[in-house]
Amino acid sequence: MSDKKRVYFRLDAPKAGAVVVLGDFNGWKQRVLRQDKKGQWATWTTLTPGRYEYRNQVDGEWSNDPEAPAAFNEFGSEKNVVVVG
């Protein structure tokens, strides 16, 4: 049985033209989110248990998700955090 869990990333940005999520779970490579009719951007990914830092880029500008937990890393940068258990 796999320890991997499905994780849902969502961002409310109805006026955005493009949204991606980047994190230490994927080597900080862009993962494209898809927009629904209400302006919600979302994607699913599968992760092993652990703590992951991530951020979004909205139309090329770095952004944190105000609805998700955040923490400062060792460099003093604020990033969103997801814990997979």
Model regions and ranges:
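Aromatic-rich carbohydrate-binding modules that target alpha-glucans
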Residues: 2-51, 57-85
